[in-house]
Swiss-Prot record:
The gene is Gatad2a. Residues 335-478 are annotated as: CR2. The lineage of its organism: Eukaryota, Metazoa, Chordata, Craniata, Vertebrata. It comes from the Eukaryota. This is Transcriptional repressor p66 alpha. Its main location: nucleus. PANTHER family: TRANSCRIPTIONAL REPRESSOR P66-ALPHA, TRANSCRIPTIONAL REPRESSOR P66-RELATED. There is a cross-link at residues 89, 174, 200, 229, 462, 485, 547, 581, 601 (Glycyl lysine isopeptide (Lys-Gly) (interchain with G-Cter in SUMO2)). The modification Omega-N-methylarginine is found at residues 221, 245, 253, 268, 280, 536.
């Protein structure tokens, strides 16, 4: 029944004239009949009593009217038919939504609504309670208590329903909020050799994405090609830089310069140096800002590779060198001091570990394992035992003779051997020596401390011995490597024999003065221009001079030896390409001239040119790492 119908019916009821006494009597008869039927069914708790007065009958009438017809209920309060028109207007309130109003068509014999008994004592005024009997009063109190309990249960249920509704609303708002302004896309985890297209939604910011979204970096592993193409909406978003690991070709095409630079991590293995689109080759071990439009900073952790060991064009035999040979060269280039420091650090860590494993000295456990209090049973037992012993001693004291008592009294008390005291709570005897309690515990603590110190000292001595052994081993290894390096450092004997006579001939004949400044300038400029040409071409340039012909013959002689068979002059590759391309000044020599020849330098331009030509064929192969230290 709707609220409007309830309001109209209540207004009609208020507009009706006051009921006469006959009408009241008729209604009273009807309601008593209905209430008697209810009592037979056992659903009603209100019993009509003949001993009750007129007020009691009126109370029952109003109760039955409120429960049977249900039309007089305008809220939670009852409707008294004797009230005037103004009182009804003042008491009229809008019905609450929790009240279920019954229609006239329903039978009064169905007093249950939603399983609850609706026969309630609505009029609980003080007069009615005073006039009613004690049994009636107790019944009313019980019923009111039940109603209160039911209302409390209903309130708890409503609170729980409200909480569940709030939780459902929160869970329903979460997916909608995820598609809202705070979009967090999880990073795609890509493994293996995969090609991620530029149109993929995980790496491309589409125009339909809502601004303010935060995209974590895509985690890319292995040899992948990632081409991230950001749309024009990238300026309103926080796009994290992609993490690139390994030898990946990372092509970045950005329409706006707001994207962060890619973070280039170290390669997992020795691979050729990476080439970024529109940039120059990044040499390993260097950190450069590449000349891309968005000024991305490419950070590369240095790792030795085959392509990063040379800065210029390399000979074909050296370009085919494997990464393992390069790694061996780098490993050999490590200084023994660094190895020694690493070994010392490992020893120190091991010493710390052993020191932590040594347990600290623990004090001895006290023998009295209880507190002397009256709440402790063991202490009470001991007190009782002491009382018993004392009683026995007192009873037996009369039987002991005077001589025995004198002997007991004349006995000297104990004295501590260490501290010479004659009083303690407990005497200790160890090896015939009587000691007090304090001295005994202090001796035990000292012994434990000495044992702990000896353990620590033994651990330190062991670590020191290991460190000394390691230093001796490293010294032996250093001596061995120095002797191995000293052997190839000596120049070839045939080269020495060639050099010395040529020098003597040059100084004897006095042809050193024939060379003028212009010829030396021309020779040095031609050498600097054609440093990548064949050695034959270099030698033909100076064929006018007899000294250069002698040097050419020395070159041919050296090239025939077995040790230098790999550097044959007939190859079309330039041997000068193994060193740096530096423009040579007048009579300038290279920085890595052999130490055996550095002693014979003179101020003469002829000698400097001869030294340069002879140094073109080194006596030993210079390692590749020597040019890039």
């Amino acid at each position: 029944m709707s609220e409007e119908a309830c309001r109209t019916r209540s207004q009609k009821r208020t507009l009706e004239p006051d009921l006469t006494e006959d009408d009241v009597e008729n209604k009273k008869m009807k309601m008593e009949k209905g209430s008697s039927e209810l009592t037979v069914d056992g659903d009603s708790r209100v019993m009509p009593e003949p001993s009750a007065g007129s007020a009691q009958g009126l109370l029952r009438t109003t109760e039955a009217m409120g429960t049977g017809s249900g039309e007089g209920l305008l809220g939670d309060g009852p409707v008294d038919m004797r009230t005037s028109h103004s009182d009804m207007k003042s008491e009229k309130r809008p019905p609450s939504p929790d009240v279920i109003v019954l229609s006239d068509s329903e039978q009064p014999s169905s007093p249950r609504v939603n399983g609850l008994t609706t026969v309630a004592l609505k009029d609980t005024s003080t007069e009615a309670l005073l006039k009613s009997s004690p049994e009636e009063r107790e019944r009313m109190i019980k019923q009111l208590k039940e109603e209160l309990r039911l209302e409390e249960a209903k309130l708890v249920l409503l609170k729980k329903l409200r909480q569940s509704q709030i939780q459902k609303e929160a869970t329903a708002q979460k997916p909608t909020a995820s598609s809202g302004s705070t979009v967090t896309t999880p990073p795609p985890l890509v493994r293996g050799t995969q090609n991620i297209p530029a149109g993929k939604t995980s790496l491309q910011t589409s125009s339909t994405r809502i601004p303010g979204s935060i995209i974590p970096p895509p985690l890319v592993r292995g040899g992948q090609q990632v081409s991230a193409k950001l749309g024009p909406q990238a300026s309103s978003q926080v796009v994290m830089p992609p993490l690139v690991r390994g030898a990946q070709i990372h092509n970045i095409r950005q329409h706006s310069s707001t994207g962060p630079p890619p973070l280039l991590l170290a390669p997992r293995a020795s691979v050729p140096s990476m080439q970024i689109q529109g940039q120059r080759i990044i040499q390993q071990g260097l950190i450069r800002v590449a000349n891309v439009p968005n000024t991305s900073l490419l950070v590369n952790i240095p790792q030795p590779t085959a392509a990063s060991m040379k800065g210029t064009a390399v000979a074909s035999a050296q370009a085919n060198s494997t990464p393992t040979s390069v790694a061996s060269v780098v490993a050999s280039a490590e200084s023994p001091a660094s190895r020694q420091a690493a070994a010392k650090l490992a020893l120190r860590k091991q010493l710390e570990k052993t020191l932590l494993e040594i347990p600290p000295p623990k004090p001895p456990a006290p023998e009295m394992n209880f507190l002397p209090s009256a709440a402790n049973n063991e202490f009470i037992y001991l007190v009782g035992l002491e009382e018993v012993v004392q009683n026995l001693l007192e009873t037996q004291a009369g039987r002991i003779s005077a001589t025995a008592a004198a002997a007991v009294l004349s006995r000297e008390p104990y004295m501590c051997v260490q501290c010479k005291t004659d009083f303690t709570c407990r005497w200790r005897e160890k090896g015939g020596a009587v000691m007090c309690e304090n001295c005994m515990t202090s001796n035990q603590k000292k012994a434990l401390k000495v044992e702990h110190t000896s353990r620590l000292k033994a651990a330190f001595v062991k670590a020191l011995q290991q460190e000394q052994e390691m230093e001796q081993r490293l010294l032996q290894q250093g001596v061995g490597t120095a002797s191995i390096k000293a052997e190839p450092a000596a120049p070839h004997p045939t080269l020495k024999q060639v050099i010395k006579p040529r020098r003597k001939l040059a100084f004897r004949s006095g042809e050193a003065r024939v060379w003028n400044n212009g010829s030396s300038l021309q020779a040095s400029s031609q050498l600097s221009r054609g440093s990548a040409t064949a050695p034959r071409g270099v030698l033909h340039t100076f064929s006018q001079s007899p000294k250069l012909q002698n040097a050419a013959s020395a070159t041919a002689l050296v090239s025939r030896t077995g040790r230098h068979s790999e550097r044959v002059v007939g190859t079309g590759k330039g041997t000068a390409s193994n060193w740096k391309k530096t423009p040579l000044s007048t009579g300038g020599t290279l920085a890595f001239v052999s130490p055996s020849l550095a002693v014979h330098k003179t101020s003469s331009a002829v000698d400097r040119q001869r030294e340069y030509l002879l140094d073109m064929i080194p006596p030993r192969s210079i390692p590749q790492s020597a040019t890039w230290k």
